[in-house]
Structure formats: C-alpha cells, structure tokens
C-alpha cells in the first residue's frame, strides 16, 4: 500500500507514475473524498466537544438540584447525529482504503517505462547456448520425458485435469535433487534460514503481500468453514511472519528460504504454454525472502538476484537478466529483475525467476516495522522476494539443455551427488 500522506503531497507525480503501470488515478475524485473526510472528521470532533461541554453542565445542574431534562435532550440529539456521521465517515474511509489497496507500487526511478515484456531491458547474459545439429534439432522437454516414460501428462489429466503432471523414476528423483541442491546452496553458502511454512494462508496474509483484493481470481480458495487459500508462492507465508511485528533493527537483514508447492489458477493465461511444464496449476519453488531496512533495500535486490543466478551458474544453464519495465512488473514490486533461462527447443529465453524489491509497500499493509534505541519511533521494513529457483522450470531447462542424441539426459555435475551417483538418465 502506498503512503496516503505521500499521495496527498505529490498528487500529480503519483498519478504520472501510476499511469506508467497502467493504473489511472483520478486526482479529482481522490481530492473530493479527502475534502469530505476532513469535513466529517471536523464535524465529529466538534460534536464530541459539544457533548463534553454539555456533560459538565449536567453535573453542575444536578449538584444544584436543577432540572436537566432539556440538556439530556441535547445530548441525545448530538449522539444521534454522531452515529450518522461516524457511519458515513467509516464508509468513506473504507472506500478510500479500497482505492489505496487497488493501487500498485510506484516504480523506482531507474525502472524503464514500458507497456509489456517487449519493453523490458536486457542487463547481462551468462553462458553460451548450446548449438544443435540441423539434422538433430533440440527436442521439447515434454517429448523427451514421454519418450523416456518419465513425464506423464495424460495420467495427471485423468487424475485431476489439464496443467498438471506426473513425474516418474529418475526424472522424479532429479526434481527432488534440484530442490535439495537449491536449499543447500542458499543455506550453506548464502546465509539463509530455512523455513517450513503452511501451504494454506488466511486472507490477512494475502492482503499483506498484495494478492488481495486484486488477484482473487488467481487463487485456489477452500470451501467450507475455513477462509483459507492455497499459497500461490511461499512469499506469502514467509513475508507475513513479520506482519504486526516491531523487529529489533540489529536483527536485520533477515534472509529466509523455503521449498514449497505453489498453486495458481493461471487466470488470464488461457491458450498460453498449454504444452509441457512451463505453466502449471501446481509447481514447486524454492523461495528467497529478504527483510531489511530502507537504506539497504536496493542493494539487497542485487544480492538476492545474484543468489538466484548462482543456481543457474552451478548448473551451467545459459541465462540472461532482464530489468522489467513499468508495465510488466508485479503489483507489489518497486523494481524487478527476471532471470530467463535458455530453452533450445524454443530457441529463446524463458522466465525462471523473478526477483523483486517491494520497498515499504508490503510492510505498510502488514504493519511490519523495526526499531532501535536511537530511533524516535518504529520505521517500516523493506521486503524483497525472488525464486531461487522454480524447480519445475529448472528441471525442464536441464532436460532440454542436457539432452543427448540417443534420447538420454546428462545429469549436471552439481547434482550427481544428490542423484546417488547417477550421471545419465536413460
């Protein structure tokens, strides 16, 4: 959530920045609501002051034995008016809050202005994409998996429906090995604290990180007595651990990681990536979350991104880093880098990680603050998150980049120990 005071003090600038994100901010309506809110607050305070004054008169008259019925009538009249105004004020404040909750984060100054992924800016590349012989072109990961009888989309469709998969045998083992490798790298080399978190979260958590109210259609929600939803990403439960907390500044930064399944309805992506493992309703991810101070936020994004990159480097998978434009960033993000891995079957780079600095946007929603003895009052923390990495997409990248002409898959050196010494999948 944006700072309401900052919005009031910088209306035109806020409107211009929000416009680059495709959000039309109605300044006139916002000002009218603020004017009305001020008027109602002033009227409320005036009536409360009148009531306090009259209440003193009641005490004085009673002490003298005088009649107080006329004064009680005035008090009742004030109470009735207060009841009406307070409800009107509450309804107006709810409307203003809903407007604030619907606003995306303001982009950082160095974020390129653009409409969609075509306006993103490439920052750097790592590794050289493997060249395949024209007579033996790269196969798609789903075709390789089906030939090996280790990826079964038909069985998953029978059990559940489309956009699910069943992994078998050594590819299932490779999937597990990847998550273990990622967790070990981040906890042992990068200093993250590993967490096990709930896969179901309440609405307060989803509001805290920005999934609600705007993206309710993307969630899988439980029916019945529990107001819970399946997590779309571990960012939600991890980041909400600091909701309604005042942290000791000395304990920051905090680096958290967790390996979880993620569940997304993929609303709005009908017809996109219908084949293979690119876009699934259920997938696994190793999430990275940073909780830090405002002065360290931007540099923390560079660090978090480098940690995600290290996974790809250890696996020797070619990739590029893209700085997302204003129109392509996630709702809560202030600045985002996407890591895109090379997929030879598509002859292009595809997203495998999104690393975002959210500033104090989520923290304001969550009331997540920090304080030390030298500070007059607590300040909002800055939150960051990123995939380190999406396990399924990393798996398919390995299948495609390490495929052999005989249909087998070489296991990256970094994973052989996690595979119990298996170096070839065939």
UniProtKB/Swiss-Prot annotation:
The protein's UniProt keywords, in alphabetical order, are: Aminoacyl-tRNA synthetase, ATP-binding, Cytoplasm, Ligase, Nucleotide-binding, Protein biosynthesis
Q: Which gene encodes it?
A: serS
Q: Which GO terms describe its molecular function?
A: ATP binding; serine-tRNA ligase activity
Predominant localisation class? cytoplasm
Q: Which residues form the signal peptide?
A: none
- Region annotation Disordered: where it falls in the sequence: 36-66
Domain remarks in the Swiss-Prot or TrEMBL record: Consists of two distinct domains, a catalytic core and a N-terminal extension that is involved in tRNA binding.
User: What does it catalyze?
Assistant: tRNA(Ser) + L-serine + ATP = L-seryl-tRNA(Ser) + AMP + diphosphate + H(+); tRNA(Sec) + L-serine + ATP = L-seryl-tRNA(Sec) + AMP + diphosphate + H(+)
This one is known as: Serine--tRNA ligase
Enzyme class of the recorded protein, top EC level: ligase
């Amino acid at each position: 959530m944006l700072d309401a005071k900052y919005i009031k003090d910088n209306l035109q600038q806020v409107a211009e920045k929000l416009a680059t994100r495709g959000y039309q901010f109605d300044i006139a309506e916002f000002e009218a609501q603020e004017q009305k809110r001020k008027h109602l607050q002033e009227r409320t305070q005036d009536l409360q002051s009148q009531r306090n004054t009259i209440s003193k008169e009641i005490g004085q008259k009673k002490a003298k034995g005088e009649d107080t019925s006329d004064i009680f009538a005035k008090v009742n009249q004030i109470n009735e008016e207060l009841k009406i105004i307070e409800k009107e004020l509450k309804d107006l404040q709810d409307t203003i809050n809903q407007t604030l909750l619907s606003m995306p984060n303001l982009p950082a100054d160095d974020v390129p202005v653009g409409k969609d992924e075509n306006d993103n800016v490439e920052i750097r590349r790592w590794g050289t994409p493997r060249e395949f012989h024209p007579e033996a072109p790269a196969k798609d990961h789903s075709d390789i998996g089906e030939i090996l009888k280790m990826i079964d989309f038909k069985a998953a469709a029978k059990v559940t429906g489309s956009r699910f998969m069943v992994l078998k045998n050594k590819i299932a083992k490779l999937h597990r090995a990847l998550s273990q490798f990622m967790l070990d790298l981040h906890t042992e080399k990068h200093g993250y604290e590993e967490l096990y978190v709930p896969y179901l979260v309440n609405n307060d958590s989803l509001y805290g990180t920005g999934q609600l109210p705007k993206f309710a259609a993307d969630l899988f929600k439980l029916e019945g007595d529990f107001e819970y939803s399946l997590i779309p990403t571990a960012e939600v439960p991890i980041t909400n651990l600091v909701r309604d907390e005042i942290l000791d500044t000395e304990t920051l930064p905090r680096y958290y990681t967790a390996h979880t399944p993620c569940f997304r309805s993929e609303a709005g992506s009908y017809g996109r990536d219908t084949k293979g493992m690119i876009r699934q309703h259920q997938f696994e991810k190793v999430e990275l979350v940073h909780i830090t101070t405002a002065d360290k936020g931007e540099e923390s994004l560079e660090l978090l991104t480098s940690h995600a990159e290290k996974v790809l480097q250890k696996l020797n998978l070619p990739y590029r880093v893209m700085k997302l434009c204003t129109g392509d960033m996630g709702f809560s993000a202030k600045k985002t880098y996407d890591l895109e891995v090379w997929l030879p079957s598509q002859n292009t780079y595809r997203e495998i990680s999104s690393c975002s600095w959210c500033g104090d946007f989520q923290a304001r929603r969550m009331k997540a603050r920090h304080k030390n003895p030298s500070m007059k009052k607590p300040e909002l923390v800055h939150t960051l998150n990123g995939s380190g990495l999406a396990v399924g997409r990393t798996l398919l990248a390995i299948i495609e980049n390490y495929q052999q002409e005989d249909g087998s898959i070489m296991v990256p050196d970094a994973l052989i120990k996690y595979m119990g010494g298996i170096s070839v999948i065939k």
